Structure formats: C-alpha cells, structure tokens
C-alpha cells in the first residue's frame, strides 16, 4: 500500500472550463489520486500570464493533462513542457471506449504557433504501475 500523499495539478483546455466534461475528469482524477489535486479553474485565481501557473507547477509531484479534440492548447502545452523540464511526471488522461486510462507523457510536439487551441500534441506510452493511485 502506498502511504505517500501527493500534490497534483490538472491541466486542461479552457474550452472545457465550467463544463460537465471538466467536472467528470476532475472527479475521476480526485477519486484515483492519493493526494490533493489542484484544478486551476477552481483553485487558482485567473492570471494574465503563464508564469504564476508554472511557479505553482514547480511545487507539485505530478501533472495530469487532458487533450481537447486530440490537441493541447497553448497553456496546457506550456505547463506540460515546464513540468517535463523540471522532471515532474506528466500523465495524460485518455478515454478508451467507456473507460478513462492514464498514460505517461514522454514528449510534446508543437504543431502550430498561431492556433492557441490546437497548439501541440503529446506522445505517451502505457504504464504498468501508477505510483499515485489510491488503493
């Protein structure tokens, strides 16, 4: 049994802020994560730049991200890139049929400089063990 208590950050598209999708993803993450999970839309004030969000991410143990229509928006892309630079594990939450699954993010690909909602893609791989799960 895992006795460690973690701090996580839920990065997601602004297009799903205050929607049922955001609520379902957040509840799934909370119910499976052994620790406190920060949702910037619910727990942080709105900042004009990405820097305050990145400063917060520096303090977390894990970053969880979701794609919107197969892409990362610029904010989520920058949050993931920063977490990876800081050696903070990043996991993507993917919908496979009726199930939600975690995969480890191993790389990011910037696909646009101008479309802020289809800014990047991620490369992920399946994992056998998830150290942050509630048991």
Regions found by a protein language model. Name each.
Residues 1-135:
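Conserved catalytic or regulatory cores that recognize and/or transform ribose-phosphate-containing ligands
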């Amino acid at each position: 049994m895992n006795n460690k208590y973690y701090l996580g950050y839920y990065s997601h598209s602004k297009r799903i802020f205050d929607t049922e999708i955001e609520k379902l993803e957040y509840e799934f993450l909370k119910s499976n994560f052994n620790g406190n999970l920060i949702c910037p839309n619910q727990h942080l004030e709105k900042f004009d730049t990405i820097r305050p969000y990145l400063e917060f991410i520096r303090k977390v143990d894990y970053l969880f991200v979701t794609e919107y229509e197969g892409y990362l928006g610029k904010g989520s892309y920058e949050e993931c890139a920063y977490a990876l630079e800081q050696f903070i594990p990043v996991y993507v939450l993917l919908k496979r049929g009726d199930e939600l699954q975690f995969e480890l993010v191993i790389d990011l690909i910037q696909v646009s400089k101008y479309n802020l909602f289809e800014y990047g893609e991620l490369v992920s791989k399946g994992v056998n063990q998830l150290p942050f799960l509630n048991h």
